[in-house]
Amino acid sequence: MNINELPFETEQMIASLRIWVEAESPSFNATAVNKVIDLAAYDLASMGASIERVPGRFGFGDILRATLDNSTGENTKAGVVICCHADTVHPLGSLHTMPYRREGNKLFGAGVLSCKSGLFICLEAVRQLIHSNIQMHLPVTFLIVPDKEAGCPSSREFIEASVRHAKYALVPEPAAADGGVVLGRSAVLRFELDVKVDTVHELKSSDHTGVKSPIYEMARQVIDIEEMSTADCNFSVGTIQSGQWANFAEKCLAEVISEAKTTAAVKESTEKMLALNSPNPDSGLHVNRSVKLPLWESDEHCKNLYDELVKAGEELSLELNHSTAGGGSLGNISGAMGIATLDGLGARGLCNQLPGACRSRAEYLEIDSLPERGKLMAALLARLN
């Protein structure tokens, strides 16, 4: 059967995707994330996959690894790993303000573009191949993690073990700005900041001691940190926490993310942040390195995999460019390990035109990209050998 003839029915895909989007799954709620893991495990088991489910660590949800082998048997050792995540940045209750809804060619909803549609598209592609008796040349493993949006602190070692012997890693993050795919991503570095003062700061109308609150000190540091950004290395403060009461603050905490485009920029980012450490262990700013997604620079293996995608796209009359991106994905891990990796295989949508929008209330996907990307994934899986 021609891949173009596979029955990717748009209306059915819209109806089925609703189930995934309405299973809200913020990274730090293991119970909620595990509901998405449940959905994936059921679908994959119904396709005949062998299921491995590993409890998460550090309070995160479970990790799912499921292997399907309807391949021709030409290579049973090194196969394809489809790297997905079940978690989103949206807290429980976000569907009240970001409901699943359709407007013209747009589907809205919390997590609809990142990450639910990417996982759904891959599952649907494999399902269609199996039901149509189209054999793949390689076994396919789905790896679904619960903590990507947090930087993969729980699943990192499991990801590395799962892709180490793979021939290809496919990552269904949203498509690039022009609808193309991603070959290479910036490193993502996280830092935890802690500001302490020698004296607990209690605001009083008669206070003329000159002691500044930890909030004041953190605010000053935030401005300095974000102004360290360059073309190759940016810094962004995402969370700040402080204050027990309106007039009492003992310390102030913050988290910084830095994206670095080159090896030199990774080194520069780390050095700049650690240089901010106070020499006094009891006061001032203290910086700790947190989780990190490594720099992924495309190599010959990735480009050869992209060539296979181009040929798959030609079967569907699709032109597919490639570019590098920030944001971080599981592709950072597989790509940095030297595995042939292809990212940005998910749907088209708002964050393709406006980076960061896929984590905002404006998030949407373009409906016509659901069957398009489903067929593209199916065509690619049928080609790889």
Annotate each language-model stretch with its function:
Residues 115-188, 385:
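Acidic/histidine-rich catalytic neighborhood of metal-dependent amide-processing enzymes
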Residues 107-120, 149, 212-215, 364-371:
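Short, conserved micro-motifs enriched in small and acidic residues
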Residues 2-108, 131, 136, 331:
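Acidic/His- and Gly-rich active-site-bordering loop/insert found
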Residues 98-111, 314-316, 358-359:
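Glycine/charged-rich beta-loop-alpha catalytic/anionic-binding loops adjacent to active sites
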Residues 87-103, 166, 184-194, 311, ...:
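Acidic-glycine-rich active-site phosphate/pyrophosphate-binding loop
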